Amino acid sequence: MEVNILAFIATALFISIPTAFLLIPYVQTATQSN
């Protein structure tokens, strides 16, 4: 089964970008609480 590199990149961006938007405020609040 051949892996389409563009589809892999699109999927990685589609997963990582919303995760970053959720993770960045969480890390900021976690660091400020200490």
Swiss-Prot record:
It is a single-pass membrane protein. It is found in: Plastid, Chloroplast thylakoid membrane. The chain crosses the membrane at residues 5-25. GO terms for cellular component: chloroplast thylakoid membrane; photosystem II. Its main location: plastid. One of its GO terms (biological process) is photosynthesis, light reaction. Keywords: Chloroplast, Membrane, Photosynthesis, Photosystem II, Plastid, Reaction center, Thylakoid, Transmembrane, Transmembrane helix. InterPro entries: PSII_PsbM, PSII_PsbM_sf. One of the components of the core complex of photosystem II (PSII). PSII is a light-driven water:plastoquinone oxidoreductase that uses light energy to abstract electrons from H(2)O, generating O(2) and a proton gradient subsequently used for ATP formation. It consists of a core antenna complex that captures photons, and an electron transfer chain that converts photonic excitation into a charge separation. This subunit is found at the monomer-monomer interface. Belongs to the PsbM family. PSII is composed of 1 copy each of membrane proteins PsbA, PsbB, PsbC, PsbD, PsbE, PsbF, PsbH, PsbI, PsbJ, PsbK, PsbL, PsbM, PsbT, PsbX, PsbY, PsbZ, Psb30/Ycf12, at least 3 peripheral proteins of the oxygen-evolving complex and a large number of cofactors. It forms dimeric complexes. This is Photosystem II reaction center protein M. The lineage of its organism: Eukaryota, Viridiplantae, Streptophyta, Embryophyta, Tracheophyta.
